[in-house]
Amino acid sequence: MENYLMSSPSQHHHPHQQPHQQHNPYANSDTLTNLPNLENDLDFSDSEVVPPSKDYQGSPNVYDGLDFSTDMATDFVYDSTLEFDLDDHKHMPDPAEMGHSKHFSVDRPLSAPFYLSQNSRTNFNHSRNISLDDTAYKRSFHKHSASLVSNAAEPPSGTFAHSHSSNTLQSSSDSMPQLSSSVSNPSLLDSPHSAMQTATPGRRHKSSSVSSHTNLYTTPLRGGTHVSPLTHTKVGKTPIGKTHRRNRSRASLEPSSAHLLATVANMKGTSNASNLALSSAQTPSGHLTASTSQHFHGINLSEANPFHNEFVSPGVGSGHLSDHDATPLNTPAGRDHSSMASQFFTPISHNRSFGGSLLESSSSAMGSAASAFPSNLSSNDLSVASSSNSSARPGMAPLRRNDTLDSITIEDQEDDACKQLRKAKSFTSFAEQRMSQLMKQRAGKSSKDLGNVFTDSTPDASSSGRSPRKDSSSGNSYSKSASVDLLSASLVVPDHNDSYLKSYPASMDLASITNASSGNHASPSPPKTSSRLMPPIESQEPSSSRSRGSSTSKPRQTLASAAAKKLNKKVPQTYPTASQIQKAATTEDIAKFAESILQSENKRPIFVKKQEEEVYDPKKKHKCPLCLARFQRPEHVKRHLKSHSSEKPFQCEEPNCGRRFNRKDNLKAHLKKIHHKNL
């Protein structure tokens, strides 16, 4: 913080101050209100000429020829028509004589102080000052200069991140620790002496400090060794008026450097990084060329990275290999390569056609004479690396463009995905394998047993002779595939004779065979006779028809039993006599209508409900004189009496219909529903 001037010039001794000079009568008054009088007094002091300011190394004033109007920040507002003559030193009075009437803040508009004089900039004395650095600042001499920062102001915290004096431009870069160059405020002295500055990539409207050629002010290594620009980015404070923008790292812009850092990170587990000497040269095109040894002090890079494989994708053969495509993967390093490789799920970990097993011992590869260097090589270098590596590893085979999925073997792998694929592949030919296995088991039996299968007239003897052997064979056949039920031996038909399959009837009930063979695990054998293997179709069909008839007769029997129950509820009764009709009928109309029905030929049999099942309802006061059914109204009884007659006096008159109904309301419902007519 000593780079900034903390005290006013009145507290320091000035070599050009005259002791007999009086203070300015306007020292304690407002400068803005007394500007005309102040200018007249400054013109009176022409006799006291101050010699031109020199720097302390004998050089002339470095402010000569500089245009501050182009380098000021955007918050300075002043009249662009003003001209400042820096060579006019005759109107420069002593600062002690002028005094410090007012100090203008940086945050205020600076248009008013610049109206002091139209010809001289030096008349605006000590109202602002630029801070001095360590080499040029001397406490015994305090020369005034054209300044932009107030003398009594506090050290700038965020407004001016870089304030340089005139000697900063010619001072050595290692005279003082420079500030960071990533601030977004434009420096006051950027041009024309800012040739050494380096712009940050990807930033616009940003200018770095003048003396930022070497970055020694980095916070983690402050004052220490030199920091590589590839690994550390310059971090600065975000200004108030600007938004924060994320800067891209230089390592991401240089693929060869990023590849080099990734290679070093992969080898940290096997050797010390301080003893690692990279034997590679940087070419002008940005690619790394491998050395002849292709080893880093005996460390094989292909063994350090478990995901490293030398086979080339089909797109590499055309010669289009970018820097990012050749960058190896950043994998965690470990000292034991076998244990580290076993921690990763790799589909090609056990396949030698993909580059060999990753669980191999690394001693053979560590001692080999040549191994592939995972760098940004051209297509020719990749072919050389793959050929040299194939001699070191016999199991390594590069994947070419003409290789297909069928040429890749999956039987050597042990992960879950390959197990599922291998199981699905084996299920396609499982039926043929099971059939051949059963044929081999049956081929080893004696001819006597086979003769019993085809020629024995007693099925009991044949089944009893074959059952113990089938128990042993079925136990062996199901030991490996117990979960497969559809391909079991009980459902496989022996392929001994083609005529046997031809004579097999289509109407054979397979459910009976499986149920019969499930108890003793014997092979299905159809019923046998003394003359032929299969029974005749005529004798076989009645059994099947009986089984089918028994299955279909069950629902019919249930329907008949339900109908019988309903009929049992109604007791068949003889037709009532006229006297009984008169007693049962509540009105004469009902009695007459019932007698007419009984006298007609279309009468139906009458079924009367049992009295104990009938529920008494006091609202239903009217009875049917024929079946004793109860109704609430007499018209309901008349409508009901029509159901006792088979006569259908109402007929549909629509063409191609002619249906008849015993009630008129049924005819209306028919016309509305079928013919869509409303009567």
Curated annotation (Swiss-Prot):
Family annotation (PROSITE patterns): ZINC_FINGER_C2H2_1, ZINC_FINGER_C2H2_2
GO molecular function, one term: zinc ion binding
Source species, domain of life: Eukaryota
Pfam families: zf-C2H2 (PF00096)
Description of the deletion phenotype: Leads to sensitivity to caspofungin.
Subcellular location per the Swiss-Prot or TrEMBL entry: Nucleus; Cytoplasm
SMART domains in UniProt: ZnF_C2H2
GO biological process, one term: fungal-type cell wall organization
Chief location bin: nucleus
InterPro entries in alphabetical order: Znf_C2H2_sf (IPR036236), Znf_C2H2_type (IPR013087)
Stretches with biased composition (Polar residues): 24-37, 208-218, 515-532, 574-584
Listed GO CC annotations: cytoplasm; nucleus
Region called Disordered, residue ranges: 1-61, 149-256, 369-408, 435-480, 515-584
Zinc finger feature spans (C2H2-type): 622-644, 650-675
Keyword Transmembrane helix tagged: no
Chain intervals with Low complexity compositional bias: 163-192, 369-392, 543-565
UniProt keyword terms in alphabetical order: Cytoplasm, Metal-binding, Nucleus, Repeat, Transcription, Transcription regulation, Zinc, Zinc-finger
Functional note: Transcription factor involved in the cell wall damage response. Required for expression of numerous cell wall biosynthesis inhibitor caspofungin-responsive genes. Plays a key role in adherence, hyphal development, and virulence.
Name of the protein in question: Cell wall integrity transcriptional regulator CAS5
Biological source species: Candidozyma auris (Yeast)
Protein's gene: CAS5
